[in-house]
Design a protein with these regions (language model features):
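Short, charged/polar N-terminal "headpieces" of proteins
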Residues: 1-46, 105-111
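Contiguous, amphipathic alpha-helical segments that mediate oligomerization or scaffolding
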Residues: 54-59
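Short acidic, glycine/tyrosine-flanked loop/strand segments centered on an H-E-D-like triad
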Residues: 40, 68-71
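C-terminal charged interaction modules
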Residues: 70-111
Length: 111
């Protein structure tokens, strides 16, 4: 006998800034994001005051891509006019409020 359990996340994430807003969709298994999130964390931790804009932008785009997918990550970056700090902030908030607990719970179930 076996058990199949899905831990998929199906979210619509609405982001508002002033009068502008965008809607991003998340349809993914958080456990499949773990490797990408680890890489994003490493890239973000390596950033410092001497990091180039290119390094910062690359880390922000990668983080957003892991969570939202490539096309929507590019939409998010464009929405914030290439402001990496805003992109990182949005991704971090979504991760901490939604994905972090799901990943932790799924990892506990696997043990």
């Amino acid at each position: 006998m076996f058990k199949i359990s899905l831990n998929r996340v199906h979210d619509r994430v609405e982001i508002k800034e002033g009068d502008e807003k965008i809607m991003l969709r998340v349809d993914s298994d958080p456990m499949r994001m773990v490797a990408g999130l680890s890489q994003a964390q490493k890239m973000l931790q390596e950033l410092n005051k001497d990091s180039s804009d290119e390094e910062t932008d690359k880390a922000a785009l990668f983080f957003a891509t892991v969570i939202f997918g490539k096309e929507q990550a590019e939409t998010l970056v464009a929405f914030y006019h290439n402001d990496a700090a805003c992109v990182i902030n949005v991704c971090g908030q979504y991760f901490s409020k939604r994905l972090g607990k799901l990943i932790t719970n799924a990892q506990k179930k696997m043990k």
